[in-house]
């Protein structure tokens, strides 16, 4: 739940990319782990040191709810997520919006 809450609280500027130098870019939420990783990258850390540093970080975020030292993978779209919704609600909302827009377009063109 901590991971979900972090996504919901995120603003559009709260993500960063790690792993560019190593050739394995990953967009994640900014946190202590991300800042330290980027610092290590800029200082020229070896690939193995970076791997060792991040080992288990995704597990810590997802299963243990560690939002500080866990890797909170997230796209830039995180800033647009404002609530937790079920997939069913999202799909139903999309279909409702589609039907409303289709009706509006048909009225304009008739």
Walk through the language-model features, giving the residues of each.
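Conserved active-site-proximal phosphate/metal-binding subdomains
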Residues: 1-110
């Amino acid at each position: 739940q901590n991971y979900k809450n972090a996504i919901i609280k995120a603003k559009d500027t709260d993500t960063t990319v790690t792993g560019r130098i190593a050739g394995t870019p990953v967009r994640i939420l900014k946190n202590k782990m991300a800042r330290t990783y980027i610092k290590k990258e800029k200082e020229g850390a070896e690939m193995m040191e970076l791997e060792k540093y991040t080992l288990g970080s995704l597990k810590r975020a997802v299963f243990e709810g560690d939002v500080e030292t866990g890797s909170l993978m997230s796209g830039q779209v995180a800033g647009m997520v404002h609530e937790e919704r079920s997939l069913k609600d999202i799909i139903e909302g999309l279909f409702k919006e589609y039907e409303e827009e289709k009706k509006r377009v048909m009225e304009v063109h008739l």
